[in-house]
Amino acid sequence: MENRFQNDTLFSEWFGQSLSDVRFPDNVTVYSQADSAVSFENVRQPIKLVRAAMGSGKTTALIHFLKQVPKELSVLLISCRKTFAAEILHRFTLNGLEDFELYCDITERQINNRKVIVQIESLHRLTENYDVLILDEIMSIIKQFYSKTMTKTKEVDCKFLSLIKNSSHVIAMDATLTRHVVEFFAAFKPDTQIALIRNTFVSAMFSNRVAYFCDTFFGKEFSFFARLEDKLRWDKKLCLFCSTVLAAEYMHDLIRSRFSLKKVLLLTSKQGKCSSIESWIRYDVVIYTSVVTVGLSFEPVYFSSLFVYIQLAKGGPDMVSIFQSIGRVRRVIDEDIYIYMNPVLIKSYDPLAPIAMPPCSDWSVAEQSIISESCIDFRGKCSGAHKYNFCSVLKCLFRYRHYIEKTTITSLSDSLFLLCSLLCENSIKVDIVGNGFPMRKEVFLSFLQILVEECHFIEKKITLPGDNMTFQEIISSRETIMNGDFYENGNQLLHKDYITDMGKFRATFLSPGVDIFIASDIVSDLKNESKRYVFVNVWLQKCVSAGVESTRIERVFNERIKSYVLPKSFLCDEYFVLGDISGVYEWGMLIDLAFLAEMIRKDLKLKSCTDTTTDISEDDLLLCAARRSSDILQIMQLVFTVHVQFFQRYSLQTLQLFNKLRGMRIVTGVFSIEKFSISILRLFFKCAFNMTLSASKPRYIPGKAYRNLTKNDLENMLDNWEISRTNLKTCKELRKALTEASRARRKQTIYKLQGSDISLSVSEVGVFGQHASPGVCVSS
């Protein structure tokens, strides 16, 4: 499973393209189907593994197979999503398979129905094994083991393996099924014959398509938006996929501003889950995000073209998810897809390393060697993830694919390469500004450079507060009255439970000096997932700093924080979970991060990991990086999926190649150990605590900002420096004299953290049982 891979085969190994070059175990028989849709005819092996592209008839073949299954046999179909499960049930019902039940329609907690469709997260509810097991979109099923919604990983993993072990027939299908899936089944059931069906047939509705990659969004005749405008002027119906909510809202507003009479539908997570797409035929333009994915397919011949806006961003959807969302529209009249990748959020000169070499024919041996070394470093760090995946066999076996998917998001060249590979494997032709794929190195690098130079930043919408009153204003106002369970002030309502919730939160998680109004502001911020993540990291680091044993921290974290609920608004009609955090789903990762953060805090002589008042000397930064660089790089990869190589790998030639693959201009000069040290610590603080490590000048008084210096402070500083302050009477005159004296002294550069110092408000004490008073009491 863990054979060494090189940069030229990394994607093909983990996304299925290399199946034709592999020697499989003796219990595996390979079937090739090239000229027709997927078929199980004359395939007698009890385990059938199918790799076939979208539109190759996988579901049709499955339905035909199930119609031939004897009535007395039990059948279980496992899906990756609830919407997919519902769509499969609908397809089954339309084709006469009416005895299947959907897991979410079964009211009993335990499921023992004979024929059932279940989402992977609910697998632990099953009490029986099944004769026939169907794993549709198996790679997406495995991917769900890394999702934060997978709360019972160990139970689901054990049940999944038990089902495979005890089923007499298994069908597993996916467009990117890999050799590792084949090897897993062959090793897990060595005495069972396995059929690997490699189907390369693709229906015309996909094989005739061409994906045009645009290098600019605005500005020229063949830019992304110019093509979109041209289509709309010809009254063509368009479907537009956007990888982020921000991009979708931006495109929605832009189209509405230019084409006010067009009917535009916007589908994002803000509008809720998308369970049906039948209404799309009522609109001129449909804009959707990854809420529309596997399981939802638009079949009517309605849309002329498909447009794809990919905003590359850490934490955004990976290229496989984007590829699956692109395929939701099954028929495109003009058979064209226009794709624009916006790298503005990943533009950086930080030493992030790519993990794959795009398949250009003219890379030099030295360039190939550089990426190969990066690939080896990447593999070495990913291998360390096994200690976090002890509760899941699936997570351990397929961790490389998970890290590849997540790491490529922050690499422009890797993202483009992987998406092009997925399109080509589905027989969709790729056109990059008039060039096919693969292409010459200079053309590929030039395309990346134009993307970066011409990319645009999307401003977030700012919602003005309007007439809304704050928590403090409502309960402090003399005009506020009690109306049932609510405090009422005009049209402003505040449920009495909100006060109780804020008092409880304050007593449990915050320092004694934090009042209930600040607690309310903090809770409002915590509605943002990234803010919750920082809050949890700060709390854990403070626990470690206080000397609390890790076993006790883990127990309290699981019992209190993971399930702690907070109101989304004053009305207390909706709640969110404090432990609903992004990125990290393993306790071991969280606690390792906390211990590393505490060691870094001590090295840098900080009060906390969000301390904004302490000056950090360059010597302390360099010493910290020298001590901790290996641990930092490991955590950066395993927790934050950011790939940075060890310093020894970064020659001038390496940096130049990496900058080219990021679309950045070549920077001359030596990449020093000082620059490397500052870069990795800057990345660490940004990822873990959303703090920015910036170069600055030393503070005149440690712990006190320049703007907060009093007249007495200024006079004492000038006296200590033996600077005459004769005729200097005002603060303005004193400040000017101090600034000029400071320049003359040519002080060394120091560093400081900038951002929100949430550590000042967070306490590790309350959650362990020491409770403060609940806070303010409001009379009715």
UniProtKB/Swiss-Prot annotation:
Xref: SMART domains: AAA (SM00382), DEXDc (SM00487)
A Gene Ontology biological process term: DNA replication
Keyword Nucleotide-binding: yes
UniProt key word Nucleotide-binding: yes
Pfam families: Herpes_ori_bp (PF02399)
Disulfide bond entries: none
PROSITE patterns: HELICASE_ATP_BIND_1
Residue stretches making up the Helicase ATP-binding domain: 39-195
Residues binding ATP, per UniProt: A52, A53, M54, G55, S56, G57, K58, T59
Molecular function in Gene Ontology: ATP binding; ATP hydrolysis activity; DNA replication origin binding
Keywords for the protein's UniProt record, in alphabetical order: ATP-binding, DNA replication, DNA-binding, Nucleotide-binding
Family in the record: Belongs to the herpesviridae OriBP family.
Function: Probably involved in DNA replication. Binds the origin of replication (ori).
Protein name per its UniProtKB record: Replication origin-binding protein
Lineage, opening ranks: Viruses, Duplodnaviria, Heunggongvirae, Peploviricota, Herviviricetes
Gene name of the record: U73
